[in-house]
Amino acid sequence: MAKETVEILIDGGKATPGPPLGPAIGPLGINMMQVVEEINRKTADFEGMKVPVKIIVDTDTRDFEVEVGTPPTTALIMDELKLEKGSQDPGMDKIADISMEQVLKIARMKFDALLSNDYKRAVKEIMGTCVSMGITVNGKDPREVQREVDQGVYDDLLTS
């Protein structure tokens, strides 16, 4: 039961049977379109970003598994807010504001890569990154919003 692993960088939601994917997995004899469809389905939320993808192929049965990595949290935040870079002085210079819904969207994208085991903790991790980037959440300091999350202010949003 030999397994072959192919690691490539794909534009989110835009995998094609052409390069770089085709030449990498073509020789393995698996159905190219099934692989492309699965990659595009799993990377749709990362449209416009380069996403690391790992394709693990069982060379005996021709079964495959697609594992999608995630871009760094800072890249997801900057993409969501259309920013070029974070603040040079995040303690004093606030450069943007992000909504709690956007924070939750990013937490859902990154959930498998985060240390959190629920969305309440995941959004707090994302807000921690906002602190270091000079980004407010709902017009407030992210640390204040983290306390509100602890108090249950956003429970309706986080359980939906």
UniProtKB/Swiss-Prot annotation:
BP terms from Gene Ontology: translation
Keyword flag Ribosomal protein: yes
Record-linked Gene3D superfamilies: Ribosomal protein L11, C-terminal domain, Ribosomal protein L11/L12, N-terminal domain
SMART domains given in the database record: RL11
Organism superkingdom: Archaea
GO molecular function: large ribosomal subunit rRNA binding; structural constituent of ribosome
Keyword field: Ribonucleoprotein, Ribosomal protein, RNA-binding, rRNA-binding
DNA-binding listed as a keyword: no
Gene Ontology annotations for the cellular component aspect, listed alphabetically: large ribosomal subunit
Protein task: Forms part of the ribosomal stalk which helps the ribosome interact with GTP-bound translation factors.
Family to which this protein belongs: Belongs to the universal ribosomal protein uL11 family.
Record note on quaternary structure: Part of the ribosomal stalk of the 50S ribosomal subunit. Interacts with L10 and the large rRNA to form the base of the stalk. L10 forms an elongated spine to which L12 dimers bind in a sequential fashion forming a multimeric L10(L12)X complex.
Protein name: Large ribosomal subunit protein uL11
Origin species: Methanothermobacter thermautotrophicus (strain ATCC 29096 / DSM 1053 / JCM 10044 / NBRC 100330 / Delta H) (Methanobacterium thermoautotrophicum)
Gene: rpl11
